[in-house]
A protein has these predicted regions:
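Flexible phosphate-sensing "switch/lid" loops adjacent to ATP/NTP-binding sites
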Residues: 1-555
């Protein structure tokens, strides 16, 4: 079978205005970026206010291998499958970050015959939203440092600047730097830090804003530093909210593309799920719900990260009520959780796979704790043995878990028909999801409830630094915000080497920070990096342009 790139390059795309017409988007709200992609003006929402919402289906997964387990592929394939059974459907995805594209994981446009296109463009720059987010973030940083340099009228303590610069690239050398060295004319020398753009608060704010005016309010209250007398300094205080919003004027509008089978798809926003909240924008999701009867979306990594934040942060804020959850599992990831090493995952091992099913079971229990109907999707890989797939199907049936095989990678929508029909069945029953915690709970209680209910961690240890900051956050009223856990995606615990379903383990809360603009408190567990590094052999070294002008090496 061809590579993802070859399949995408061979695809015949429909003009994007035709895709918009299929989605019910009038031409006057379409802002074309060539023939294959467009932005949809947010003003369209004003005309859709009286339309009922469609059904929202969340795709999540078990704890993944480092290569990922195909949530995007399943999301896209399921949307195509629903379209094939004559449902009015849209998909909502996050925009890929260039860091992982050139690093290790790759893009987020699906795989095989379940892809969104134009694949190359989506993975590389797209409509410029990442650039706008990076620019808005770094504009705030520049205005902040300029204020300190120009007499420091706000009495900012340079050692307590919390706003970090960002770049949409994996570059470990920028994690800890010193700026304004050597000359006083360069500014006030201080320690600084870069995060990857998708971990920035601007990205989170974009994805949680309801419109451009809401974005300006949110960015204005974002905390950038503290004064010498321990008072927070905001973007409004340094008078940068208006300029940052101007930069984001076009980026606030969702991006419209299509799947290989021409299903309309929004791609908008892309916060990391192990650091930020891991969901596409509220704007795109709510617009899709007005346009389609079924909206399929994904949340990053496993249910312990993306799904928890989707339900406890995004849905609570945006007043969304999901109709069902698809839990993606792969034979190879289950074998990893059953003790098989990465290099041996292609070898059949039913015993290890069933041992690793405890990880799947925990994620199912997490979804059940939110009071939502679910179905397990076995995302098939070419090297899965029939014995392994049959054993997993039997395990699901014995535990009364709804299950379907998903073969979108090899067959597109045709490989997702069973899953599509079963998703329709489970969404026919009205449900009301229940968050894990109340926002009025204390910070400690919110964290503990997540650790106990979602991770299965009976013990939570708070560092002295965290306890001190919690008392400070209470004074500012930040203790009533939702919490956004920063944790390794590779384990239910904060230790990436603990596979399966760990028991009797401790979750270590090392630090907290406030994202007052986004509207949550970030809680750090273990050692989480906000600026990734490149692997020993980055994917980038195998990429290029051939003599015919075609890209190669991009998956």
């Amino acid at each position: 079978m061809n590579t993802d790139l070859k399949i995408a390059q061979a695809a015949v795309l429909e003009p994007i205005d035709k895709i918009a017409q299929k989605a019910g988007i009038p031409e006057e709200y379409l802002e074309l970026y060539g023939k294959e992609k467009a932005k949809v003006n947010i003003k369209l929402m004003e005309t859709l206010a009286d339309k009922p919402d469609g059904k929202l289906v969340l795709v999540t997964a078990i704890n993944p291998t480092k290569a990922g387990e195909g949530k995007s592929t399943t999301t896209i394939g399921l949307a195509d499958g629903l379209a094939k059974i004559n449902k009015n459907v849209m998909a909502c995805l996050r925009e890929p970050s260039l860091g992982p594209v050139f690093g290790l994981k790759g893009g987020a446009t699906g795989g095989g015959y379940a892809q969104v296109v134009p694949m190359e463009s989506i993975n590389l720059h797209f409509t410029g939203d990442m650039h706008a987010i990076t620019t808005a973030n770094n504009l705030i940083a520049a205005i902040l440092d300029n204020s300190i340099f120009q007499g420091n009228p706000l009495n900012i303590d340079p050692t307590r600047v919390t706003w970090k610069r960002c770049l949409d690239m994996n570059d470990r050398t920028l994690r800890d730097i010193t700026i304004a060295q050597k000359k006083k004319s360069n500014g006030v020398e201080r320690e600084d830090h870069f995060v990857i753009t998708v971990a920035s608060e601007v990205m989170a704010i974009l994805c949680l804003s309801k419109d451009l005016q809401d974005f300006e309010k949110r960015i204005g209250r974002a905390v950038v530093a503290y004064t010498y007398d321990n008072q927070p300094v905001t973007v409004n205080d340094i008078q940068a909210a208006g300029a940052a919003t101007v930069v984001m004027k076009e980026a606030i509008n969702p991006n419209l593309v299509q799947t290989l089978e021409h299903t309309p798809t929004f791609i908008h926003g892309g916060p990391f799920a192990n650091i930020a909240h891991g969901c596409n924008s509220v704007i795109a999701t709510k617009m899709a719900l007005k346009l389609a009867d079924y909206v399929v979306t994904e949340a990053g990594f496993g249910a312990d990260l993306g799904a928890e934040k989707f339900l406890d942060i995004k849905c609570r804020l945006a007043e969304l009520n999901p109709s069902a959850v698809v839990v993606v599992a792969t034979i190879r990831a289950l074998k990893m959780h059953g003790g098989v090493e990465q290099e041996n995952l292609d070898q059949p091992n039913v015993e290890a796979m069933l041992a690793g099913a405890k990880n799947l079971q925990k994620h199912i229990e997490t979804v059940q704790s939110f009071k939502l109907p679910f179905i397990v999707a076995i995302n098939k890989f070419a090297k899965d043995s029939k014995e392994e797939v049959d054993a997993l199907l039997t395990w699901c049936h014995e535990n009364n878990y709804p299950v379907a095989e998903a073969d979108g990678w090899a067959k597109g929508g045709d490989g997702m028909l069973d899953l599509a029909n079963k998703v329709v069945d489970i969404t026919d029953h009205a449900c009301k999801y229940q968050p894990i915690y109340d926002v009025n709970d204390s910070i400690e209680t919110k964290i503990t409830k997540i650790c106990e209910t979602v991770y299965g961690s009976p013990h939570v240890e708070f560092s002295e630094l965290t306890n001190t900051k919690i008392q400070d956050f209470i004074k500012h009223g930040w203790d009533k915000l939702p919490v956004c856990m920063a944790k390794t995606p590779l384990s239910l615990s904060d230790d990436p080497t603990l596979k399966g379903r760990p028991e009797n383990f401790v979750t270590h809360i090392t630090d907290i920070s406030v994202s007052a603009g986004a509207g949550f408190v970030v809680v750090y567990t273990g050692n989480v990096l906000t600026m990734p590094g490149l692997p020993k052999v980055p994917a980038a070294v195998n990429m290029g342009i051939d003599e015919s002008g075609e890209t190669y090496g991009l998956f």
